């Protein structure tokens, strides 16, 4: 059985179709806001909020909640707002606040799971949460529809407020001077990133989420020069890498999250090489 025959065989299973749909949507959403975060030098906030999401999921597990997403989403959004507010406080700089909250949430989450978890395989559960697991291949139809709904909201927010996000990204001072509510749009960006991170936990795990946000944006910046082109290129690269990564992980039996990140890293290397060649050619 060749590769194409294997793909056709696996495509008959609903869980494979669900995984591809969700993976592509999460990759698309991550790439759209990734460009903004990289340009604003907020890349670390994705990593910080992913640790917070782990803490929220740990609390939901301890409370015996069958659906972790509502509580995890609420905790992550609340911390995104807190980090944004704290980052504007001159006493605690933004990067220090992110490090403090993320490390604290990660430590408390693991502590709670050790103290109160009834799982017989705690180490496996923690490892799966941190680095991703096969849970992306066991999605229910309701989870898929929830992901589709939230992804549509994220894309609509980005499209509807594109001009304002662009202005706040490149020159926040000028945006404020012309009447743009820069603080409000920064808050909107933080909330949307929190939603994306919670969605992405099933795909790549909490420790690898920032790769989905950073790698496509950095890869696109090696090839394109303006914001719109970088955003479109980032989206195409992110979706392509997610699709290839999920398919490769299914065929090779490797972890989904790590495989997607490995493909993203390879794409970044190729884009760097292509950027240098194009630069020399011009």
PLM features: residue spans?
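Membrane-interfacial amphipathic/re-entrant helices at transmembrane-helix boundaries
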Residues: 1-28
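Hydrophobic alpha-helical transmembrane segments
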Residues: 20-24, 69-74, 96-100, 144-149, ...
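Alpha-helical transmembrane segments in multi-pass membrane proteins
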Residues: 22-30, 52, 56, 60, ...
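Short loop segments and helix-boundary regions at transmembrane helix junctions
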Residues: 35-120, 220-232, 249-253, 276-277
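Helix-loop-helix "hairpin" substructures at the membrane interface of multi-pass membrane proteins
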Residues: 139-216
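Transmembrane alpha-helical segments in multi-pass inner-membrane proteins
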Residues: 202-258
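Cytosolic-side transmembrane-helix boundaries in multi-pass membrane proteins
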Residues: 257-282
């Amino acid at each position: 059985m060749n590769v194409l025959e294997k793909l056709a065989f696996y495509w008959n299973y609903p869980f494979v179709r669900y995984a591809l749909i969700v993976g592509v949507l999460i990759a698309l959403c991550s790439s759209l806001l990734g460009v903004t975060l990289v340009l604003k030098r907020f890349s670390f906030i994705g990593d910080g909020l992913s640790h917070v999401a782990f803490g929220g999921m740990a609390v939901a597990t301890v409370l015996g909640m069958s659906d972790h997403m509502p509580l995890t989403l609420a905790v992550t959004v609340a911390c995104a707002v807190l980090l944004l507010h704290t980052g504007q406080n001159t006493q605690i700089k933004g990067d220090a606040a992110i490090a403090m909250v993320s490390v604290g949430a990660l430590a408390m989450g693991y502590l709670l799971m050790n103290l109160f978890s009834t799982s017989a395989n705690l180490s496996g559960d923690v490892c799966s949460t941190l680095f991703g697991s096969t849970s992306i291949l066991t999605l229910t139809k309701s989870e898929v529809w929830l992901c589709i709904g939230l992804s549509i909201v994220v894309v609509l927010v980005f499209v509807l407020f594109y001009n304002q996000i662009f202005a706040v990204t490149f020159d926040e001072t000028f945006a404020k001077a012309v009447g743009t509510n820069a603080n409000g749009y920064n808050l909107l960006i933080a909330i949307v990133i929190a939603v994306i991170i919670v969605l992405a936990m099933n795909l790549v795990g909490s420790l690898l989420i920032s790769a989905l946000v950073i790698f496509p944006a950095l890869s696109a910046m090696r090839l394109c020069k303006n914001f719109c082109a970088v955003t479109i290129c980032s989206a195409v690269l992110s979706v392509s890498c997610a699709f290839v990564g999920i398919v490769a992980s299914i065929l090779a039996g490797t972890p989904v999250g790590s495989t997607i990140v490995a493909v993203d890293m390879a794409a970044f290397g190729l884009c760097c090489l292509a950027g240098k060649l194009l630069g020399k050619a011009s």
